């Protein structure tokens, strides 16, 4: 026996040299070789897909099957030694065709098919197994389930015999074929039985030998017990037949080699000629013997797994179900391919997933550049690679596994896609808010009017365009989840909400600016009205021109002034709000808030004027205007004969009438509070709690306040009125006493003898004046001037001016003296000793000075507010 050392048997150590000439698929102990896939990879058959062919050889033991395969395909199967007769091939061996062309010099038409795999099956009828035909049947079933062509190796003299012609083996083949067909009615697989008649002498024509074999085969087929529904089936329904004769290898070696070369040309792809049909309409085979219908449609990369599954079913005496095995193989291989594809997919997508997860964890989602193209390419390559490798397997399983793979890929891509849209959504909202705010601030800095609605519309359009651009860039074609219309609608809705919120915020800022404008205007106007109290009778507080207002109509003027100011503010608010594209409801809420806040401003200003110090000052000014000035506004010079008591009483009682007048906000025309509740109006239905939370409750308007409109209009309480009355009377009494003292102080009691003494002692001077015209003229001018001054009531102002001048001179003298003392050491010591001896005196004039200073500061604040709100 000649054995080649470069064969890989079951259990051999993995070595590339062992695969050089073949591999043992199944050993004599019926063990399957797990290294079959390695051999196919070594021979580069795995990537062939369906472009491979499998041939099995049957025949009796020691009939030259291995020799035939070695001669025909250039393989190196072990052959029997000529010196002994014994079993050579044990189990099932497999090798790839090493003979690509039938002979050198032949054209490409004679080239053998690519990737021909040849299985050398253990011979039958051997003495080693004896009557044990279990392996014979199992090997036949395995070969039939995997092979396209079954070569039956027989000698010419065995034709017509039963055992010698392997008819028993063929009967087994037919039986297992029916068994397979019963399980696989959908595909109806066919096989080619290729009879190679050895030691063919040519005495008996090959056609006669062919007829004999076909008759024997038909007889065997007809004798089979066929399953239900297949009773009338014919052998040609499942098998095609081919025949070839080879001369004796030893006696006719050259002719044997030549016939083998010719025979090898038939092992290529063929087809059926529709113009040459048999009785059943089946076209004759033209060209090579490999027809597509013979192929078991098992991809080369899955053949090892498929063959192992088939053998496992066979060796365990289970019903062999080829469709199920094909499905199981498809599931196994598709899962393997899917895992391999996902590895490459992970390499392309995982970096983006990591970046996105990191950004989300940091709370700052980012739009990833190049994500869309990366997802499209990764998905396309993954699906394409899967299709290339897995589409050759069972269609239903392939489609199912492809769908599962796409689901896995799409689930991850969808998460990335939605994360990208979420980041675009968030960044777009932020950029939209910042852009609108920046545009508004720029408009405010320019000092020009700006159209808020136009700004929002422009920025919203840009934001949507940017979002759509980023969304389109992330779209993966042919996926349902790539439709971003829902996210776009949500984004547009959020932009609307943000725009609305920005508009409401801007309207609140507008309302604040208008409120400051109202506060500034009301502050100035109310100051003028309250400063004019007492000017109705003339005096220092009376206006120089126009009508002199009456105290009785004070609240009417205040209410009219307030309403007119707020109406002007409402007009300004409405005009500016129109540029915000604000709704009617929003404008109504803004106006309602403006009226309420304006009333709060007015009430605060009135409360400021009604402070104890301020109101006492107003009452004193009013009293002094009536007491110290006449109806023409001329200051009174009190004389002993003046009726000071009656003037004082009238002035005091007139001023006391102001206290109840000022204590309640009442209109003189109606003698009732102004209609504040109607003027403010009901709360708009569109007002939100946020619109009301910063508003001060108003009595008579807010039911929950618990105060009536009458109480809201009460400016001075009863206790405060009584206190003001008492304190005012004390102040008025002081003024009266001062006036009385002034009148009494003007009375002089000159004794009569004083005039005689004056005449006696001043006679010389009198004579000198009378004799000197210059002196006399000067005396005359002085007398006339004094008379005119008296008639014009100018002595009082002259005296005051003199006193003021003297006071100014005194202050200047003190300043010069202080500077002198500070410049000398003695002066500094004297000043140090005098510290702590000064006391402060407070009277109503000091209060007036403080009020004036406070008014100045208030005016400054009003001026500042007015400067801020010049645009209104």
From Swiss-Prot:
One of its GO terms (biological process) is endoplasmic reticulum membrane fusion. GO terms for molecular function: GTP binding; GTPase activity. Residues 771-773 are lumenal. Residues 49-307 form the GB1/RHD3-type G domain. GTP binds at residues 59-66. The chain crosses the membrane at residues 750-770, 774-794. Keywords: Coiled coil, Endoplasmic reticulum, GTP-binding, Hydrolase, Membrane, Nucleotide-binding, Transmembrane, Transmembrane helix. Its EC number is 3.6.5.-. It is a multi-pass membrane protein. It comes from the Eukaryota. Residues 690-704 have a biased composition (Acidic residues). GO terms for cellular component: endoplasmic reticulum membrane. It is an enzyme of class 3 (hydrolase). Residues 482-504 form a coiled coil. Residues 676-704, 849-872 are annotated as: Disordered. Its main location: endoplasmic reticulum. Residues 1-749, 795-872 are cytoplasmic. Belongs to the TRAFAC class dynamin-like GTPase superfamily. GB1/RHD3 GTPase family. RHD3 subfamily. This is Protein SEY1. It comes from Paracoccidioides brasiliensis (strain Pb18). The lineage of its organism: Eukaryota, Fungi, Dikarya, Ascomycota, Pezizomycotina. The gene is SEY1.
């Amino acid at each position: 026996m000649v054995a080649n050392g470069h064969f890989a048997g079951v259990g051999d150590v993995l070595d590339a040299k062992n695969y050089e000439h073949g591999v043992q698929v199944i050993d004599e102990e019926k063990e399957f070789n797990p290294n079959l896939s390695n051999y196919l990879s070594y021979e580069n058959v795995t990537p062939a897909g369906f472009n491979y062919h499998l041939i099995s050889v049957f025949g009796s033991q020691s009939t030259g099957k291995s020799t035939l395969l070695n001669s025909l395909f250039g393989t190196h199967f072990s052959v029997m030694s000529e010196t002994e007769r014994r079993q050579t091939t044990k189990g099932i061996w497999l090798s790839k065709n090493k003979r690509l062309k039938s002979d050198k010099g032949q054209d490409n038409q004679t080239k053998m098919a690519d990737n021909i795999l040849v299985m050398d099956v253990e011979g039958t009828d051997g003495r080693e197994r004896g009557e044990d035909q279990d392996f014979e049947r199992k090997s036949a079933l395995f070969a039939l389930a995997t092979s396209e062509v079954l070569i039956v190796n027989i000698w010419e003299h065995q034709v017509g015999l039963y055992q010698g012609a392997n008819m028993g083996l063929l009967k087994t083949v037919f039986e297992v074929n029916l068994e397979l067909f019963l399980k696989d009615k959908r595909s109806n697989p066919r096989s080619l039985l290729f009879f190679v008649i050895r030691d063919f002498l040519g005495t008996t024509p090959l056609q006669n030998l062919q007829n004999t074999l076909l008759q024997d085969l038909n007889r065997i087929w007809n004798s089979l017990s066929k399953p239900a529904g297949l009773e009338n089936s014919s052998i040609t329904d499942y098998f095609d037949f081919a025949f070839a004769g080879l001369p004796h290898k030893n006696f006719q070696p050259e002719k044997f080699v030549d016939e083998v070369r010719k025979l090898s040309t038939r092992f290529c792809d063929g087809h059926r000629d529709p113009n040459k049909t048999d009785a059943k309409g089946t076209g004759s085979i033209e060209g090579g013997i490999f027809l597509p219908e013979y192929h078991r449609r098992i991809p080369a990369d899955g053949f090892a797994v498929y063959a192992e599954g088939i053998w496992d079913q066979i060796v365990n005496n289970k019903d062999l179900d080829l469709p199920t095995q094909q499905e199981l193989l498809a599931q196994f291989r598709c899962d393997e391919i899917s895992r391999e594809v996902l590895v490459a997919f992970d390499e392309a997508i995982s970096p983006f997933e990591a970046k996105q997860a990191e950004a989300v964890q940091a709370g700052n989602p980012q739009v990833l550049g190049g994500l869309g193209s990366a997802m499209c390419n990764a998905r396309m390559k993954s699906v394409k690679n899967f299709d290339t490798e897995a589409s050759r397997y069972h269609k239903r399983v392939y489609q199912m596994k492809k769908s599962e793979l796409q689901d896995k890929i799409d689930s991850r891509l969808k998460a990335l896609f939605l994360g990208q849209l979420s980041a675009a959504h968030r960044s777009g909202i932020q950029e939209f808010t910042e852009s609108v705010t920046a545009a508004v601030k720029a408009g405010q800095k320019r000092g020009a009017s700006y159209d808020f609605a136009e700004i929002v519309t422009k920025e919203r359009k840009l934001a949507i365009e940017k979002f759509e651009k980023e969304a389109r860039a992330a779209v993966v074609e042919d996926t349902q989840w790539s439709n971003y219309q829902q996210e776009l609608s949500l984004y547009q809705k959020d932009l609307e909400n943000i725009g609305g919120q920005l508009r409401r915020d801007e309207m609140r800022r507008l309302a604040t600016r208008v409120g400051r404008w109202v506060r500034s205007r009301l502050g100035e106007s109310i100051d003028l009205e309250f400063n004019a109290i007492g000017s109705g009778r003339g005096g220092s507080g009376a206006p120089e021109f126009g009508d002199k207002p009456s105290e009785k109509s004070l609240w009417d003027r205040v209410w009219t002034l307030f309403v007119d100011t707020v109406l002007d503010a409402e007009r300004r608010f409405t005009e500016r709000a129109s540029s915000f594209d604000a709704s009617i409801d929003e404008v109504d809420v803004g106006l309602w808030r403006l009226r309420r806040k304006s009333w709060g401003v007015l009430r605060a200003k009135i409360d400021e004027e009604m402070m104890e110090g301020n109101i006492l000052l107003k009452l004193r000014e009013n009293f002094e205007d009536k007491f110290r000035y006449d109806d023409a506004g001329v200051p009174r010079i009190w004389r002993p004969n003046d009726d000071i008591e009656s003037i004082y009483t009238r002035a005091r009682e007139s001023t006391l009438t102001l206290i109840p007048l000022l204590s309640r906000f009442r209109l003189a025309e109606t003698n009732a509070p102004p209609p504040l509740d109607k003027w403010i109006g009901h709360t708009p239905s569109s007002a939100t709690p946020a619109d009301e939370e910063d508003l001060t409750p108003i009595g008579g308007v807010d039911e929950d306040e618990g105060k009536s409109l009458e109480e809201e209009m009460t400016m001075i309480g009863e206790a405060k009125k009584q206190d003001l009355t008492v304190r005012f009377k004390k102040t008025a009494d002081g003024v009266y006493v001062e006036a009385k003292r002034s009148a009494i102080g003007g009375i002089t009691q000159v004794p009569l003898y004083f005039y005689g003494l004056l005449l006696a002692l001043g006679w010389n001077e009198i004579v000198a004046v009378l004799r000197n015209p210059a002196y006399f003229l000067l005396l005359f001018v002085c007398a006339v001037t004094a008379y005119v001054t008296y008639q014009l009531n100018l002595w009082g102002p002259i005296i005051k001016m003199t006193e003021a001048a003297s006071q100014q001179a005194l202050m200047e003298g003190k300043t010069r003296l202080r500077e002198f003392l500070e410049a000398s050491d003695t002066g500094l010591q004297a000043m140090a000793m005098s510290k702590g001896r000064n006391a402060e005196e407070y009277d109503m004039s000091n209060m007036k000075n403080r009020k004036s200073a406070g008014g100045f500061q208030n005016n400054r604040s009003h001026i500042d507010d007015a400067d801020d709100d010049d645009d209104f």
